[in-house]
Amino acid sequence: MNGFLHDAEKGTVDIIVQSVGRTSILLSQLNVGDCLADLVGPLGQPSHMEGLKKVAIVGGGVGNALAYPLAIGMHKAGIHVDMICGFKTKDIVILEDEFRAGVDRVFMMTDDGTYGEKGFTTDKLKALLDSGEKYDEIVAVGPAIMMKFVCGIAQDYGIPSVASLATYMIDGTGMCGGCRAIIGGEPKFVCVDGPDFDGSLIDWDLLIKRGKTFAEQEAHDREHICKLTGGVRSNA
């Protein structure tokens, strides 16, 4: 679940939900007028923008919703922003118009080639770098495996990288330890210390392993709740 836009005057927050497990499926089935008991956020530390003149932001899947406020905020701060948006297929593309209206350049990628260019976000990033594009920083937002490879490419080209992590969060205060990640050999809590970390310091293998902790439970709950409610309303 990712909040990507807020309006302080109207008192509204726009949220994009991808139906994965029990909770997100139930959220996707809410109707106009339904209520959520509590909504907590934002958590962690603000993203840094000091000293940046040109950045590439790489978003994967629903991670593009998290990338959106960062991209817009950087552009408003006078930073040149190239946005690379990646999706598995055309049916789950989100926020293209919003990105095009708010940043300098947008590159749309789909794994199967049904929309934009065919290929992965890493393919486009490497193509831009090989063509001579220079960036002060590369930011990755999305699935852990994608962020791992994006940050690896940045390191290969000698460019600083930042990964915006989205781990399991339970209490949002650092007490439960569910969002723990190893950064530079030390434990950090994404909800308090993050979500942004130096991509070259993240223990990616452990992060990916921890991200699969509830995969079996999610699959079981998804099947169960779909049987009870008659299916998932939408994919995102």
Question: Predicted segments — roles?
Answer:
Residues 64-66, 144-145, 166-196, 224-232:
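Local cysteine-cluster metal-coordination motifs and their immediate loop/turn environment
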Residues 189-193, 197-236:
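Short Fe-S-cluster ligation motifs
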Residues 36, 90-92, 130-136, 161, ...:
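Short secondary-structure transition/capping segments
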Residues 151, 174, 202-203:
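Short acidic, glycine/serine/threonine-rich loops at helix termini
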Residues 6-8, 20, 50, 174, ...:
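A short, compositionally biased micro-patch
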Residues 1-32:
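Ferredoxin-reductase
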Residues 102, 181-182, 204, 219:
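Short alpha-helix boundary/capping motifs
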Residues 22-170:
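FNR/FR-type flavoprotein reductase catalytic core
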